[in-house]
């Protein structure tokens, strides 16, 4: 019963559950005198105006959802910053919506910098005591809303990100450093709002949903600002020598001082409206209705993708699965087969010296397949790992899937060599003609990654 079709359909249910347009639409309600956004109420007057500012992988669809609910008479301006590869999905956005693109392959570029300057200019132009700035924020926002602090330039910031990613930095570590190299991240965007108020509807792509780190927290005033000791600890934990960093970056981080930020008043509100948990619940509901004993194990899976892949292989080959590393602290009780184990979160990849092409989900599944070369499955299984944004690393694949039927073919390609070369994409492209790739195209959102493991008795 552990079938690929069930797993693929369950992943599709994940994507439907976190569809940004409907999520934003459900978060906003309007009557003649009252605007309700998430859990916050605004009394409307004849002078009330709303400026919608959306940035991130879900920005276009989130903007559509907001405009579905808001009267045109209230809307002063809508400005959207979307990933370059999403050009063409902006249909149904009205002509008065300004859409800017940037951050191809999820890295900041000069287009991102230009778009950020445009956002700052619009905030300054429309700021008034009767203005509500509605921010729609999603994963990828860090790359799209970019304004390096002087004297840094974009190339220096990019080099810093590259170094950190090569050392396996988590999104939390990356965004903490980004905040300290930026004029808009870490609540600094709010410095531009002198009179109006802001509310942010946020789709989380960070484990644990820390609102101050999602998209590097441009609309969130930190409860405690980082000091240079926190920054040093991050670099030391990643084994990054400061001498590896560009000189200007090193100087900015070493001379870090507390920022002058607005007081954290009721003028600035932030609400998380979607996360990895929403996707996992949808998959669990579908699989339960399909006859599986379904369990959400965690939405906080982290660590090295290749090592996690080996741990999934351990579950597959253990008769008593609850003794495996990934499950031993889960309080999981297995009563009846078939079972569905669901995981969510975000892992990292340590790149080889001359890396090929790949992503953490493809690497995790490849590592699992490679580990099964020397171990015998104790169950019929199907295992999928895929990113909800549809883009695993700088590739056109969301992830990969394997099951028992793939094991006899495992010797046809040298999976270990592809792993060592950080070249998981090309392995899956060649393996069975690409049949094991998960190809969804860009989903228009991002709530991190999903792992689904179906197990049945042999």
Curated annotation (Swiss-Prot):
GO terms for cellular component: cytoplasm. Pfam families: DUF4147, MOFRL. Gene3D superfamilies: Glycerate kinase, MOFRL-like N-terminal domain, MOFRL domain. One of its GO terms (molecular function) is glycerate kinase activity. Belongs to the glycerate kinase type-2 family. This is Uncharacterized protein C13B9.2.
């Amino acid at each position: 019963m552990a079938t690929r079709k069930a797993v693929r359909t369950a992943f599709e249910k994940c994507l439907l559950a976190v569809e940004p347009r409907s999520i934003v639409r459900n978060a906003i309600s309007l009557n003649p005198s009252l605007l309700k956004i998430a859990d916050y109420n605004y009394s409307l007057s004849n002078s009330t105006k709303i400026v919608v500012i959306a940035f991130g992988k879900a920005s276009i669809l989130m903007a559509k959802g907001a405009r579905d609910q808001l009267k045109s008479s209230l809307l002063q301006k809508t400005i959207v910053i979307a990933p370059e590869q999403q050009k063409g999905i902006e249909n149904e956005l009205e002509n008065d919506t300004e859409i800017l693109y940037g951050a191809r392959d999820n890295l900041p570029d000069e287009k991102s910098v230009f778009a950020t300057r445009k956002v700052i200019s619009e905030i300054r132009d429309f700021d008034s005591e009767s203005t509500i700035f509605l921010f729609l924020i999603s994963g990828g926002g860090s790359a799209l809303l970019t304004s390096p602090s002087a004297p840094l330039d974009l190339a220096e910031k990019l080099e810093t990100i590259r170094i950190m990613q090569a050392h396996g930095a988590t999104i939390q570590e990356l965004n903490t450093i980004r905040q300290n190299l930026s004029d808009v991240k870490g609540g600094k965007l709010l410095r531009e709002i002198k009179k109006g108020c802001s509310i942010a509807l946020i789709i989380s792509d960070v484990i644990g949903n820390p609102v101050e780190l999602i998209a590097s927290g441009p609309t969130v005033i930190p409860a405690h600002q980082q000091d240079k000791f926190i920054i040093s600890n991050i670099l030391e934990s990643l084994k990054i020598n400061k001498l590896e960093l560009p000189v200007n970056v090193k100087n900015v981080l070493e001379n870090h001082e507390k920022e002058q930020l607005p007081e954290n008043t009721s003028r600035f509100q932030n609400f998380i409206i979607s996360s990895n948990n929403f996707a996992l619940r949808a998959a669990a509901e579908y699989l339960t209705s399909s006859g599986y004993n379904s369990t959400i194990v965690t939405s906080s899976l982290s660590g090295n993708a290749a090592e996690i892949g080996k741990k999934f292989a351990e579950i597959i080959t253990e008769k008593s699965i609850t003794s495996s590393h990934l499950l031993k602290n889960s309080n999981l009780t297995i009563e009846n087969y078939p079972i569905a184990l669901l995981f969510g979160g975000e892992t990292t990849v340590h790149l080889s010296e001359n890396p090929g092409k790949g992503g953490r989900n493809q690497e995790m599944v490849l590592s699992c397949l490679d580990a099964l070369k020397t171990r015998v499955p104790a169950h019929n299984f199907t295992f999928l790992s895929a990113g909800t944004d549809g883009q695993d690393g700088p590739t056109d694949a969301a992830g990969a899937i394997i099951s028992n039927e793939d094991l006899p073919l495992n010797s046809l390609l040298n999976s270990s060599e592809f792993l060592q070369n950080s070249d998981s994409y090309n392995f899956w492209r060649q393996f069975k003609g690409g049949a094991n790739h998960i190809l969804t195209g860009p989903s228009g959102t991002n709530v991190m990654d999903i792992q689904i493991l179906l197990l049945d008795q042999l």
